[in-house]
Amino acid sequence: MTPPSATETAPSLQGGLKMSVTDKSGPDRVKRNELAELEIASQMGAPDVYIDAERGTEWYLWKGSIYVKPLRFENRSGLYVIVLKTDPRAELGKHRHRGEVRAYTVRGNWGYHEYEWTGKPGDYITEMPGTIHTLWMGEGSEVMFNVVGSIEFFNDDNTLRETLDSFSFWRMYVEHCQERGIKPNEKLWY
């Protein structure tokens, strides 16, 4: 896209924004830059995505009594967004994250045996890459996790048991959908 000349009107963007380009400096220049950046975002950016939590994805049993509901898979960065829930108290083995994890407590309580805090509804937690801990979830808990990269699970003797990433959680979701005779929602990849 070529920039408008000093006498042209920039194209309408983002709900009808228009501007007259008459000066190469000052407030008009800022507006021109903002409009140019909005145009770049509309042409090059990813679209907004809505996932219906009831019809756009499925809970599946993962480990023990812990269920997973996938909300997003992104193959460029390795990001995946999942919700974990359990009815009885549950634990997930000792594991290490190779990327950052962000968590939001929807309901119940949860934490890691290695830490003193307990997540409760509304709490937000950030975990740094390389941390090793053992997840516990209280009865009736539900937590949304934004995970980047892989998770390595360890045996009791600290040997590596398995490595999971976005492709692993997608595979488990697809297998669950196939067992139920439903089509996996490919729009979860964005």
Segments and roles (model prediction):
Residues 65, 70-96, 128-131:
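Conserved short histidine dyad/triad with adjacent acidic residue
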Residues 90-92, 108-112, 124, 151:
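Short beta-strand segments in beta-sandwich/barrel cores
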Residues 113-134:
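Short acidic-glycine-tyrosine-enriched beta hairpin
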